[in-house]
């Protein structure tokens, strides 16, 4: 795993779930790792695909977001998503069509 992919994952976690507790951040990190694994693409390719994940380059990554990225990348604990490759914030958007799949 290259340093750019690791940094991008930590930045994505902080951008998408910066205000969530650690378990939420870990879940978001696992979603990206799962998507890369399932698609056979690199993590960097998955993270930089248009309109998939928010990555705010102006943010300073918190320790907990960086830790969550390390947990998912190194599979330091069981995947709390059960292998999910998508997530959504129910407080931000209505239930997406793929939710029940």
Segments (PLM) and residue ranges:
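Bacterial extracytoplasmic/cell-wall-associated proteins, especially those involved in peptidoglycan
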Residues: 3, 7-101
């Amino acid at each position: 795993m290259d340093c750019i992919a690791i940094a991008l994952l930590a930045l994505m976690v902080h951008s998408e779930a910066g205000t969530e507790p650690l378990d939420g951040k870990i879940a978001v990190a696992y979603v990206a790792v799962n998507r890369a694994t399932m698609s056979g693409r690199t993590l960097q390719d998955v993270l930089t695909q248009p309109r998939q994940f928010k990555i705010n380059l102006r943010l300073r990554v918190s320790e907990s977001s960086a830790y969550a990225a390390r947990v998912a990348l190194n599979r330091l604990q069981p995947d709390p998503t059960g292998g999910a490759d998508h997530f959504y914030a129910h407080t931000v958007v209505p239930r997406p069509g793929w939710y029940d799949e």
